[in-house]
Each structure stands twice: as structure tokens, then as C-alpha cells.
């Protein structure tokens, strides 16, 4: 039996009182001071996240762009060096292999940031379909990754560098930034809905940088944030979580990722026929947001009903600390997708009333 892997920050999390769990084969902190406190800290001050478990895959070669255009439904051709694209990646049947970010390093080199639990599966799928002869490298073990998110994130990080961070726009990145002696790639991205950055460094420099950022933010309320709060933060802004809102059985169109599926790009891509067919014939289910009217918290895989009939299931649900409401995401038959429409959630043996609401639930300022 293989033991979970440790990120370069494992010892620091233990020192800070992090409650460590096995998350998708990694030892990671689920919480430090408590989920509600950590969510509100990130929304109001700034939070520091260990995301070193995420996978890093390099795609390189003269045909790198041609290859990626085949592999993903988004249009990688419109990406310029220094910019980032979010995309799903599909199987031939339209189901989702993963969703990830693509960083364009230069004309023939791209960096993919993939979900931790999917890294090996993604790498195999990328290799299996590599008829273009591009070079594929899984460099996940060489990278550490730290995210700093929240209204004070930029102010705190700026204390460590002369590089003007305000010049790094949303979904842009800069390489070789000197953070108090640590060389880093910095992007203005995140999984919280707040302003902030994701920072890529050599694995062996991760702990040193983490402590430098902690010191820089100690008077601004910066705190370490665990996976529990990270999940609530992404849920409040309705960002999909692989395994919940995306899976091999769920297509990007069902998950409402239409802006990231370019059916009219000139290149064919894996899964295109199925997605075109779904768009033309209509979807059998669609992702919606809902708010509880009755007491109760919707949990993953609870059944959704209308007039006593099953119409779908919950993909994610939580009490929202930011909005002080019980909210859910779930897949339902499209005919029930009208804002304000009342549905029921089967919570244990009872049903509780809920209503369809607009997403995202929360938008920053």
C-alpha cells in the first residue's frame, strides 16, 4: 500500500497546528483555525494556501500548439506568451478527463497546471494521443506551489519584490520574479474568487518562501488556509471541482463551461462530435445553483426532486459563511432550470424545499 505524499510544506503545517488529512494521495491540512474563520480571512484580509500537490506538465515542440488544439476544446491559438487559458479536456465520448490552466511560456512551449489526483491519468492520456511527436514532461515533483488570495494579497506580496505586481493582469503571468531572493513564476490566478496570485517555485525553496510571505503579512491578518475553506471559497463562486461538477460522465457543456468550449474553432478536438451533438439536440441535464428555503444543508449525491419525481442530484453543497445561506450546486433536467423555481432536496428521509438561483452565488465587490 502506498503512503500519501507530503508536500514541501508538510512540517510547517504540523508546526502551525494544521489538521492533516489524506487528500487524493497527499497529506494536506484540512483546516488551521477553522473553516468559517479561514473563509472570512480570505474574503476580508488574505489567505495563504499550499497547492504544491497540483500537477505541472510541460508540452514542448514545433507542433505543441497543433497538439493542444486537438487535445482541448478551448482555443489555444489565441493565447499569447505570458498569458493563461482555462480549459476542460475531453474523452472521445465528451466526458471530462480534467480541467486545467495552460500557461504559454513561448511559441512552442506550454505549461499545464492539472488537478493533483488526475496528474498521472492526464499525463497518460496526453501521451496516448501524442501523434504529433511533442515532448511531454511531468515535472510535478520539481515544483512547489503557493497561492496568496484576498484583498490584501497584492500589498503583502509586493513587500517581497521590486517587480510591480499591479502590471501582472488577470490570467497573465511573469517568470523569474525575485521574491526576496527566491526566483518564482507568478500568475494572477486563483480558486477563490478573490484577487490574488499563484506562485511556482522550486520544490526545495517552497518552505523558505512560505515563511517569507508569512512574515510579510503578519500585520495584515494573513493566515494559512486549509482545504476545507478552499473548497467553500471555490463553491461560493461556483468554480467546478473535478469529481463533483466534472467527471468522465459529465461533459463540459452539462457543467456550463460553454465559454471554454470553442465548437467553431477550425481544428477538430477530442470529444467534439459528442459536444456538437449535445449543443444541437439539447442537454439531458444541466448544472444549476440553488438556495435552501427549509433548514438543511445539501450534500454531494443527495437527490433533487420536483413534485415527488426525481429530477437530478447535488454535486456540491455547503453553508456559505460569506452569504450566511445554505447553498447547493447540482445537475437537473433542463426544463426545471428557471430562476425562482422551487425544488426539493432529499435530506435523509425528509425532503427540504429549495429554489433555483443565479450563479455565481458570490461576486467580489
UniProtKB/Swiss-Prot annotation:
Keyword Transferase: yes
Sample GO molecular function, one term: aminomethyltransferase activity
E.C. numbers: 2.1.2.10
GO biological process: one example: glycine decarboxylation via glycine cleavage system
Catalytic activity: N(6)-[(R)-S(8)-aminomethyldihydrolipoyl]-L-lysyl-[protein] + (6S)-5,6,7,8-tetrahydrofolate = N(6)-[(R)-dihydrolipoyl]-L-lysyl-[protein] + (6R)-5,10-methylene-5,6,7,8-tetrahydrofolate + NH4(+)
Keywords per UniProt: Aminotransferase, Transferase
Domain of life per record: Bacteria
One GO CC term on file: glycine cleavage complex
NCBIfam families: gcvT (TIGR00528), PRK00389.1 (NF001567)
Function: The glycine cleavage system catalyzes the degradation of glycine.
Family: Belongs to the GcvT family.
Quaternary structure (record): The glycine cleavage system is composed of four proteins: P, T, L and H.
Protein name in the entry: Aminomethyltransferase
Organism name: Natranaerobius thermophilus (strain ATCC BAA-1301 / DSM 18059 / JW/NM-WN-LF)
Lineage: Bacteria, Bacillati, Bacillota, Clostridia, Natranaerobiales
Gene giving rise to this polypeptide: gcvT
